[in-house]
Amino acid sequence: MNYGKKGVRAKQKALNSKSQKWGRKLALTCVKIMLAAVVGIGICGVAAGIGVFRGILSSTPTIRLSDVVAVGEATIVYDSEGNEIDQYVSTNSNRLSVGMDEIPDYMGKAFVAIEDERFYQHNGIDFKSILRAGYQFLKTGGEEAQGASTITQQLLKNTVFTDWTSEGNNKIKKIKRKIQEQYLALEITKYYSKDEILLRYMNAINLGQNTLGVESASLRYFGKHCSDLTISECAVIASITQNPSKYNPIRHPEENAKRRETCLNKMLKLGFISQAQYDEAVADTDAVYERIGLYDIDYQEANATTGSYFSDAVYEQVKQDLILAGYNEAMAETLLTSGGLRVESTLDPKIQAILNEEYADPSNYPENVKWYLNYALTIISSDGTKNNFSKENMMTWFKENQNKKFNLIFSSQDDAYAAVDTYRSAMLAQLGVEDNADNYEETITMTPQPQSAMVIEEQSTGHIVAMIGGRGTKEGRRTLNRATSAKRLPGSTFKVVASYAPALDSAGKTLATVYNDAPFNYADGTPVRNWYKSGYRGIQNIRSAIRDSLNIIAVKNITVITPRLGYDYLLNFGFTTLTDGVQVGNEIKSDVNQSLALGGLTYGVTPYELTAAYAAIANSGTYVTPKLYTRVTDSDGNVILDNTNPPTRQVIKETTAFLLTSAMQDVVTSGTGGKVNFGGMAIAGKTGTTTGPTDAWFAGYTPYYTAATWTGYDNNVDLNSAEDGVSKTLWRKVMKRVHEDLPNPQFPVPSGIIQVQVCSQSGKLPIPGLCDGSVYTEYFAEGTEPTESCDVHYQGEICAYDGLPASPDCPFKYTGVASGRGSCITTGLHRHYQQSRRHTDGQHTEHQKSV
């Protein structure tokens, strides 16, 4: 370079030239423009960023701490003594809220130590964690870093931003949610204490095994309330939350143990526990997981997702009452399974335990248990087509190909499985599909037979105190409940409620009213048959007809009072399954007919409704709507449903109820129900058997409880003589134990009941010297007692052959006292005598027939 004067002057001259000046100005202008553009873009970018940020914040939900709760909470069902008996819970709804005073101090400290050790120092956001999370976010290409969120943010994530699981790999959605999460975390921390936030967190956090919150988790893993947990156990639960699947202490105890160790170390480091407490917890490591494993076995056995028949019935009744209260069906079910309701049921745990034990006792059933097969088969053809076969298809195939009497009832389970193998092979061959387990799916269930169900009600309150809907293993929740859902023909139990109750109550009949047990036909000409095989018993009063369950008299009685009256009384007794003109196939069916007296119905009734009807008689004629619960509240104690005073109505007079009770006491002491009698307890009831018999019942009551027991085959196979008595056996054995420690009062006699001596052959006042052998004392509702004298007994010429008043030409007459209407009949020896006379003198005189 030339740095002399001459060189410098030359350089200066060049710089001052016009062309050089223009070039410099142009370059400078370009630089300025570029700088302005950069600044402008930066400003726009910042403005846009601020706008986006403001947009995100503006879309952040406005919340209060009361809004920060888990969405779902299990509904708990309690028995009448306040013990939990069941939970209704949907997925992600098994949460039980508790107060801070019910959570051990070490539980909160364990969560703080493992999840957010600076929880009590930061303002809802831990900036150190954010920096660490940001670094991990960039390093992993957008995957959110573990431990990035504070306890406050996790609470919001699990209660407010519950749809975060749908974000997938959408980074924009994740960033938006994180910004809103952090903003709300700051807001919540401004207005609420750390302990309030921590309590909400511990009641909401997902802790695996479909549990939300520490109370639910404590009960699931340890079988005790969280207030009773040790430091060791608190650390187990706190170690789950980061990844409830990976750190599940039942499925992955080794993974949970590693994180638990970290939790305990941090608790010690932070001064939350002493060295001695730490050492004790560490020493418990093996034992704590052993306890969890052992309890899980017990839990699985006790809570095999089947629930109880009683709990199932409670669910249905609460659901229906919620619908009546204005909820639609979907809303009612959601509220029941995730609304955190508290249901106070009427179940008496002691009585229910007795019922369960007796139904599980093999000695209460015939020795040779039979099995009913329920089978479904799906065969997958080579082209992927699914071919479905039901148990009905199976039964049809066997009847057509092997056994016309095939009915899905087997003497052993082995026989049932053999039949399944035979049928499956035949169907596979029919479709040309290889007999390979990959080519078919099947469902096989077997239930012991005959089946049975029983309901027990406290008649004075309408409380259903116990219920069982079947014997054997319950297959699942809300499966067939024979106590509430199975409609079976009630047989002779209906004689009382359909025929005699209305007759005594409003048709002028009394227990002394007599009918002739003699041949009688229904209106269509079909003979009415008595349950005993041959003969008739002649004149019988209603008391003896109830005691001995006489079919003909029950039908004659309802014919006189009209089936319509009987039907109307049944509706008032609470039966909801009756029909009055319904199309079944091509026929119009109605239960308003003479066979109503014998339980001849279109569909049948349930043990639940039959129990309630008999309970009305036991309760002095007052029907109390049967109830399975008294109150339903939300988790805060607000009453949702109040069932403490269910509707009642007077179905029959108090005097009518007593008369029926008196007659049904005879059933137990000297009639068809003698097998149910026990001790000195007053019992009234009625047996019921249907044609076949396919159904066997006993419905009865004491001064305390009413119960109905049904026995039969699920597919209506006839009961044998040993099986026919199961209902009475179960009724007696259950009710005897239920009443063991109770006094033995008699049924009270209400005012308006009087006793009058009557003639059993006429139901009227006896005539001295004529009715002496037929006089007995009967109860009457005052005003219904007889005022006329006997018109059956007769003094004069008697037929020696049949004991009736002799007709004029009876060859066997003598002078004496007879009972019976009409005169002697032309049968047997009489006809032989008449024929001999016809041969001798050509004369013939017919005897009158008795009525």
Language-model segments: residues:
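Conserved catalytic neighborhood of penicillin-recognizing serine enzymes
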Residues: T140-T162, Y295-N303, G508-G566, N593, ...
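Non-catalytic structural connector segments
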Residues: Q275-F406
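Mid-domain, small-residue-enriched loop/turn segments at the edges of structured enzyme/sensor domains
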Residues: T526-W531, T562-L610
